[in-house]
Design a protein with these regions (language model features):
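N-terminal carbohydrate-binding accessory modules
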Residues: 1-69
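Hydrophobic faces of well-ordered beta-strands that scaffold small-molecule active sites
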Residues: 3-9, 72-74, 108-112, 161-163, ...
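Active-site beta-loop-alpha junctions enriched in small/polar residues
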Residues: 10-12, 77, 113-117, 165-168, ...
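Aromatic- and acidic-residue-enriched segments that line the glycan-binding/catalytic groove
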Residues: 17-30, 86-89, 117-135, 177-185, ...
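An active-site-proximal structural segment forming one wall of the substrate-binding cleft
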Residues: 44-72, 82, 86-114, 124-165, ...
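Short acidic/His/Gly/Ser-rich catalytic and metal-binding motifs that mark active-site loops
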Residues: 80-83, 116-126, 172-175, 297-300
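Extracellular glycoside hydrolase catalytic/binding regions
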Residues: 152, 159, 168-322
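Aromatic-rich peripheral "rim/lid" segments of glycoside hydrolase catalytic domains that contact
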Residues: 305-320, 324-370
């Protein structure tokens, strides 16, 4: 497997309110499902199409390639093929993404980011506070069908790196501590919500691999998220005998700050030491990718007003993280951008560090270090 240096194209085909709040202003909703419920169908479709046409363009793929990256992770929804109204399908934009990627020498990891009734209850799962997809066999089958159709449509494209089976199926500890848990708008809809059990996930991954691999050659990679349980997979992958697979983990240092509120480099190093011990253990049986990470941290953000000191601190933390990821099979920065206008101020200073394009512009990240 090539060493991945990549970025995520989040909030393009799967919306996340915090990244572009103006899309949600007229409805005061928190996720894409409720946005679709509050707007008239035609108005919703027009809003989505305008966003997709303008949020990511060919120019972005050129920019990504010119900054020494070789892969993009592209989150796609369960309604990709336009068969779950009122949601708007997105194969038109995925097709464009492949054309642009191949033009600029990039590859794409297609990432199934949402499923009906959600796998995590996050806004990025499409329905905040609801998480019981795994309890619906018909919707589990639907997700498998989406994966198979993605493999059929894109499996032979030279720009395809691989397909990720499912983003962030939630574990018990993460579900119990997630801010979104218990925040569903419709409490009836949220009944039965809970974490995704590991036995179910192992079975789903086995079935998904078979469905994808039928249509995708072994030169393409099937990627599995660790479900926030990085060390739970060794025996499974050792016995599964899959070909060309990788495990995806999402080691965000900002998440550690919620539990250890000491924003100092030595604390981040200690946290990453623990993360890397888990990754090394997992890599005895499967390559591991840091599929989402960023340099967001309070150590740098708290001195944002001092541009020189702030930049120095972000570079310091970036080096710590990038040094760690060199031991992995590669990484994808979350996210490529937040606001389309890179000169427009974000409503919170910390959001700047989630935006790769701004990190490069601000000198917080240097492509020579990738």
């Amino acid at each position: 497997m090539k060493l991945i240096r990549g970025t995520n194209l989040g909030n393009w085909l799967v919306l996340e309110k915090w990244m572009k709040p103006d899309l949600f202003e007229s409805t005061h909703t928190e996720d894409e499902t409720w946005l679709s419920r509050k707007l008239p169908t035609d108005e919703f479709a027009a809003l989505i199409k305008k966003h997709r046409d303008t949020y990511v363009t060919e120019e972005d793929f050129r920019f990504i390639s010119e900054n020494r990256l070789n892969t993009v992770r592209l989150p796609v929804p369960y309604f990709t093929f336009g068969d779950r109204p009122p949601f708007v399908g997105c194969v038109e934009w995925i097709d464009k993404a492949f054309d642009w990627a191949e033009k600029y020498g990039l590859q794409i990891l297609l990432d199934l980011h949402t499923v009906p009734y959600s796998q995590n209850g996050y806004d990025n799962g499409g329905l905040t506070g609801v998480c019981h997809w795994y309890k619906h066999p018909d919707e589990v089958e639907f997700a498998l069908t989406v994966l198979e159709r993605l493999a059929q449509r894109y499996g032979k494209r030279p720009g395809l790196f691989g397909i990720e089976v499912l983003n962030e199926p939630i574990s018990w500890i993460v579900y119990m501590t997630a801010p979104s848990t218990g925040k569903a708008v419709d409490k009836e809809e949220a009944k039965g919500s809970g974490y995704v059990p590991l036995p179910f996930l192992r079975d789903f991954y086995t079935r998904a691999y078979a469905r994808i691999r039928k249509h995708m050659g072994e030169d393409k990679t099937v990627v599995f998220h660790d479900g926030f349980r990085c060390t739970a997979w060794n025996k499974f992958f050792r016995e599964a005998k899959f070909t060309n697979v990788a495990l995806d983990t999402h080691p965000y240092i900002f998440a550690m700050e919620n539990f250890v509120p000491i924003p100092r480099p030595w604390v981040y190093k200690l946290y990453l030491s623990g993360v890397m011990n888990q990754i090394r253990s997992a890599q005895k049986d499967i390559p591991v990718i840091a599929g989402e990470w960023c340099i967001c941290n309070k150590y740098a953000d708290k001195v944002y007003a001092d541009k020189e000191l702030c930049a120095a601190r972000y570079r310091e933390i970036a080096k710590i993280e990038l040094d760690a990821w060199r031991e992995t099979a590669g990484w994808f920065y979350w996210n490529y951008q937040l606001l389309r206008d890179r000169e427009a101020p974000t409503d919170e200073t910390w959001k700047q560090s989630w935006d790769l394009s701004r990190c490069l512009k601000n000198g917080w990240l240097d492509p020579k270090d990738f």
